[in-house]
Amino acid sequence: LQSHKHDISFHGGYIGFFSYDYGADQFVDVSSHPQPSFFLGEYSTFLKFQDGAWYFYSDEKQAQHIYESISSLLSQAQEDQSTALQLLKKCAPRWSKAQYFAAFNRVQEYIKAGDCYQINLTQEFKATAQGTLLSKAEQLWQLTHAPYAGYLKLDNFELLSCSPELFIEFQHERKIKTRPIKGTMPRFNDPNQDHAANAKLSNPEKDQAENVMIV
């Protein structure tokens, strides 16, 4: 852990998440676990992993004390092997193969009926484990090389994430940047390659649908 100052996009503020369950819960009861589906917390102290190291940021008056407390907790965590995440029972899907195909066929009927344009059909995978997700965070991020990632712990609830996509970034002078991947293609300096990529993106129905829905 190092105390360092970088020109970073995040200088403190809200950290949290919105889950799909939060949106769905406005219309149907989807609660199956005692865990939050939405959380926002305002933080002026945070850690960020960049350039191969962790950096500490804080606008608090007691920043030095907070830094020392976090350093102490991290040292204790490294010595405590009980926090290492271990699977006690393998991951298993909530649905059987037959149940998944039934849900898939129902989605097709919804689309044919015009009730929806696209549906992202997913299901829950469950496992029994001991330890904390934090012990696997760095390993996951190094494995995926995802440019956007985070870890959040709320009481007994943990959230570990990584993504290649940037949804929304608020910049200076009221600018908003987004970098989706679905329905997009890379740009090329060569005009012929750029034109070919544009044609490839414009023609397939799948890419057109994703572009209309997401981009």
Where are these regions (language model features)?
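Extended alpha-helical targeting/anchoring segments
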Residues: L1-V215
